[in-house]
UniProtKB/Swiss-Prot annotation:
Protein name per the record: Bromo and FHA domain-containing protein DDB_G0267958
Sequence ranges of Low complexity compositional bias: 46-79, 208-221, 229-275, 283-306, 406-431
Stored Pfam families: Bromodomain
Domain of life of the native organism: Eukaryota
InterPro entries to which the protein is assigned, alphabetical: Bromodomain, Bromodomain-like_sf, SMAD_FHA_dom_sf
UniProt-annotated stretches for the region Disordered: 46-83, 208-361, 403-442, 659-729
Domain spans labelled FHA: 112-167
Statement: the UniProt record of this protein carries the keyword Coiled coil: yes
Keyword Coiled coil in annotation: yes
Compositional bias segments (type: Acidic residues): 310-341, 668-729
Signal peptide feature range: none
Coiled coil: 315-352, 659-718
Length: 729
């Protein structure tokens, strides 16, 4: 009975536990209904009651109820994960003008875009000429390198500079501390992520030693003969008789000489040109003799070795041409030092003739110095070559590019020898003046200025001109030529237009009837004043470079044929539109050409003639024509003075030719008479100009004759003064 009672009590307790657990689950489901993951977590953490666990006693049955509720309170905070910190690859420091750091930006992704757009770009730079996506900085995780990639056209890449180097047209590798300039805004890179650096291997420099010992060989080598001043000493033989023995000047012996018994004493490591002097007893007397020395002949070697630093010279450039003067000066200084040493030794010997020690030591010392000089020259068979190479390897100031002589033939000079007599005074040798070998640079003809990258407008701001491509320039020409051809193809369809437009067309035809030519042209060579403005520039007149420059500078091209086609085929095209387009034609020509040009002059002259024709036809008021004429004539005068100053002749306006329209009829006889009169007037003007030139030449000749007479008078006076001084002496 006791067992059944306990079993019943345990069943009641289990039912209560199940109810409590269900109540807790309902509360948690209501609280966390929005989060499905938390619901599943709470369900898994709550234990399901086991019916098999009915045997434990009463004190142990209450413990599962407390343990099951505790996990539910601890599961909720564990599901919220903390936000991960993003990796920083580099820092971009924004610099001020003085180089100080203004602010910095952390690069937290592998690609960073810099531009003017606030949405597309990570860093905004609002400056003129900056595109929405201007440049990007990339970090390659595989190669572990940072790259700078410009996203704009290479022609506009002057806005992007790496370490102040402009015109970046491809992806460049960045280094730690590099400065990126975008629209004159400097950004300094600081790497935080590890970067691999490519180790640059410099090429090995092969230096040639200037003085290397040479062994005796049987190969003939051409060496310039070098002479040394002979030393004269008197030696005593066994019979104590004094004889004068003069040593001949020693010359460098070619290495083709065969070794004899006497020369077998010379060791192999020393050059063959060394001479051995026999030991002589102490002399009792010394005599001095004046010796004549010959300077070393300057012989240019056949093959000159170039220095490593001479990469910028041409193939035909010779180092010896630049160092001839220095070599001659050094040789003269060496000779003068030798002469001073000789004079000092002679004075010492003459002052103490009976001193045996001094008489022995001084000549021996003199011979030793000569032998040392011969050793230094003979140590390298090409002594002169080694001297030139040693100078070539030294640091020197290079000639400017304009003064270098490209492809100048090297002409070897003949060896010259100058004799000098040893005297206590220094002998001065007068050198003939050298002719300047620098060729005259021809003057470069003036070329019209190309498109500028930036210009300053009236307000002082920079106005950037963007260069267009050659393809775009050709498209502009093609579009305008199709519009210009309408005038030629449908020129007979003028009947449908208004009378005002017909008068406008007649006024433009006046520009075709007025011709001009230069004084240097032939009498029959003339062209209309509107020839330069008839069509827009095309490939028939310009090359590809000038064509792109023209249409980069001229944003609104216009021509007279385009105006005529608009007059004929555009209904609402009136006189105001026509004058605006005509002024645009002249403005384009004056923008591209300089002020002191013939086209600039013709533009103002065409303007006067067109407004004059429009005023005569009554389309515009006469006051407007007079104002335009006054302004344009002042321009014509100033341009004319500039052209005369530059030596350019002004265009000569020829009378109007016969009109091509059938409505206007001009008799041919009158035209011929007018042409003859004009030709006669032109001939008279040319004769008058020639007469003026002849008079100017005669005046110049007379002035030169007077100057020559004055010079002769001065020479005669000088001769008389010299004669008087001679008579006085």
């Amino acid at each position: 009975m006791a067992d059944s009672v306990t079993i019943g009590q345990l069943e009641k307790l289990s039912v209560q536990c199940d109810k409590e657990n269900q109540h807790v689950e309902n509360k948690e489901n209501n609280i966390n209904s929005d989060n499905i993951n938390l619901l599943e977590a709470t369900k898994t953490t709550l234990p399901i009651p086991n019916t098999s666990n009915t045997n434990p006693p009463m004190n142990q049955s209450s413990s599962p109820t407390t343990t099951t509720t505790t996990p539910t309170t601890t599961t909720t905070p564990t599901t919220a994960e903390p936000a991960k910190k993003r990796k920083i690859f580099a820092k971009l420091h924004l610099l001020n003008r003085d180089g100080s750091v203004k602010n910095y930006f952390e690069m937290k992704k592998t690609k960073l875009i810099i531009g003017s757009d606030t949405e597309l770009a990570d860093i905004q730079v609002v400056r003129p000429g900056i595109y929405p996506k201007h440049v990007e900085i990339i970090y390659d995780k595989e190669k572990k390198k940072f790259y700078l990639n410009p996203l704009i056209d290479p022609k506009d890449s002057d806005n992007v500079r790496l370490n102040f180097v402009p015109f970046l047209h491809k992806k460049e590798v960045l280094g730690n501390g590099d400065i990126i300039s975008i629209g004159f805004r400097s950004i300094k890179m600081e790497f935080i992520e590890k970067v691999t650096v490519d180790q640059l291997v410099q090429p090995e420099k092969q230096y040639i030693p200037s003085n290397t010992p040479t062994c005796i060989t049987n190969t003939p080598i051409q060496t310039p003969p070098t002479t040394s001043p002979p030393s004269s000493t008197t030696t005593n033989k066994k019979d104590n008789t004094s004889t004068n023995v003069t040593k001949k000047p020693i010359a460098t012996v070619p290495s083709t000489t065969t070794s004899t018994k006497k020369s077998s004493v010379v060791p192999e490591s020393k050059p063959a040109t060394k001479t051995i002097t026999k030991e002589t007893p102490k002399p009792t007397k010394t005599t001095t003799t004046t010796t004549v020395t010959t300077s070393k002949p300057t012989v240019k070697p056949t093959a000159v070795k170039k220095s490593i630093n001479d990469d910028d010279y041409g193939d035909d450039y010779n180092e010896e041409e630049d160092d001839d003067d220095e070599e001659e000066e050094e040789e003269e200084e060496e000779e003068e030092e030798e002469e001073e040493v000789e004079s000092k030794q002679i004075k010492v010997v003459n002052s103490k003739p009976n001193d045996d020690d001094m008489s022995c030591k001084k000549p021996m010392k003199y011979t030793n110095t000569n032998e040392e000089m011969r050793k230094s020259l003979a140590s390298n068979v090409g002594g002169i070559n080694s001297k030139i190479i040693s100078k070539g390897d030294s640091v020197r100031n290079l000639l400017p590019i304009s003064s270098r002589r490209p492809t100048a033939p090297v002409t070897p000079t003949k060896p010259t020898s100058t004799k000098k007599v040893t005297t206590p005074k220094k002998a001065t040798v007068v050198k003939p003046p050298k002719e300047s070998k620098v060729p005259k640079v021809p003057k470069v003809p003036k070329v019209p200025k190309a498109a500028v990258v930036a210009s300053i407008d009236e307000n002082g701001k920079e106005d950037y001109i963007r260069l267009i491509s050659f393809k775009k320039a050709k498209d502009i020409v093609k579009a305008f030529q199709s519009h210009e051809k309408l005038v030629k193809s449908k020129n007979n369809g003028h009947g449908n237009i208004s009378n005002e437009k017909k008068e406008i067309l007649k006024c433009f035809e006046v520009l075709d009837q007025i011709n001009w030519r230069l004084s240097t042209d032939k009498p029959g060579d003339s062209r209309p004043i509107s020839s330069y403005f008839k069509n827009i520039p095309s490939l028939s007149e310009f090359d590809s470079e000038l064509l792109t420059d023209y249409y980069s500078m001229i944003s609104e091209p216009m021509s007279i044929n385009s105006i005529l086609s608009s007059v004929i085929y555009t209904a609402d095209y009136n006189i105001d539109n026509c004058l605006d387009d005509f002024n645009q034609v002249l403005e384009n020509s004056m923008t591209y050409n300089s002020e002191n040009s013939i086209i600039y002059w013709l533009a103002h002259y065409c303007k006067i003639e067109l407004y004059k024709a429009l005023s005569n036809s009554g389309i515009i008021q006469n006051k407007l024509y007079l104002d335009i004429k006054k302004d344009s004539e002042t321009f014509l005068k100033s341009i004319g003075t500039q052209l005369k100053g530059d030596g350019i002749s002004l265009p000569q306006i020829i009378a109007q030719s016969v009109s091509k329209n059938k409505e206007q009829t001009v008799p041919q006889e009158e035209d011929e008479e007018e042409e003859e009169e004009e030709e006669e007037e032109e001939e008279e003007e040319e004769e008058g100009e020639e007469g003026k030139e002849d008079e100017e030449e005669e005046e110049k000749e007379e002035e030169e004759g007077e100057e020559n007479e004055e010079e002769e008078d001065v020479e005669i006076d000088d001769c008389e003064i010299d004669q008087e001084s001679d008579d006085d002496q």
